[in-house]
Curated annotation (Swiss-Prot):
Its main location: membrane. This is Photosystem I reaction center subunit IX. It comes from the Bacteria. GO terms for biological process: photosynthesis. It comes from Synechococcus sp. (strain CC9311). May help in the organization of the PsaE and PsaF subunits. It is a single-pass membrane protein. Belongs to the PsaJ family.
Length: 39
């Protein structure tokens, strides 16, 4: 359990960084696809 508590925040930080990076890259190449439903 102690090992899980130390690895979970690290995995979460990496996951959020990857997700944010993918969204930023996707928005840079396909801005219309990302924002079209909201507009």
């Amino acid at each position: 359990m102690k090992k899980f508590l130390t690895t979970a925040p690290v995995v979460a930080a990496i996951w959020f960084t990857l997700t944010a990076g993918i969204l930023i890259e996707w928005n840079r190449f396909f801005p219309d696809l990302l924002f079209h439903p909201m507009g």
